[in-house]
Amino acid sequence: MDNKRQEQLQHFWEQFHLPAIDLEGLDLALTHPTYAFEHHLPGDNQRLEFLGDAVLGLVVATYLYQHFPQLPEGDLTRMRAAVVCEASLVKVARRLRVGDLLRLGQGEEHSGGRERPSNLADAMEAIIGSVYLSGGYELARDFVLQIFTPALEILSDTSFIDSKSALQEFVQSQGTENVVYKILEEWGPDHAKGYKAGVFLKNRLLATGLGHSKKEAEREAARAALALLKVQG
């Protein structure tokens, strides 16, 4: 790696104010298969992408498990998927200008590869993988939580006073039809009932919520659905 490239990567990493990492690994994370092929390099970022995908999933799953103790597994799964999906990764990559750092083959470069969503998402996962290999799980966790702060803050926002109205306003602003609430389960004696509500959009279950009354369960379902829709953007 020449000095210019090293300075470029060092500048990128310093913005996070985290312990130093192996810049060779970061460079590999930004190496597209077409570049590796054209320059006869022994590796590209695909294996790091595989590793980073697993690390990202674990970090986000742990965060959701700790911050949403009342949510069932199905909602946690949907929330994790919203955070780690390609669209979310691309948002992060563009905010960090990862495309400027990619090493691409000539054909990929000339066909818009620096802004191609799949390239940006793959590179973000590969970067996470390289951080994990360089500094271990704790450093990778700190990195992931920092770069995904906007998405995680949306999920953690419990300030929706009237979550049902807020959800309805949001879906109407997107030009879609009204949401529908259904009580999916109820249990317990009359003096201590528990309810599970689901909120549906176009017959698709968005999220569920639990409560001691039907209205409380519906509000919790609306809050979870609103967070998911905002993250998916």
Swiss-Prot record:
Positions of Mg(2+) binding: E49, D122, E125
Protein known as: Ribonuclease 3
Gene Ontology cellular component list: cytoplasm
Primary localization: cytoplasm
Domain RNase III, residue spans: 9-136
Subunit field text: Homodimer.
Catalysed transformations (reactions): Endonucleolytic cleavage to 5'-phosphomonoester
Broadest EC class assigned to this enzyme: hydrolase
GO molecular function list: double-stranded RNA binding; metal ion binding; ribonuclease III activity; rRNA binding
Subcellular location: Cytoplasm
Active site: D53, E125
Pfam families: dsrm, Ribonucleas_3_3
Cofactor(s) of this protein: Mg(2+)
Transmembrane segments: none
Family label: Belongs to the ribonuclease III family.
EC number(s) given by UniProt: 3.1.26.3
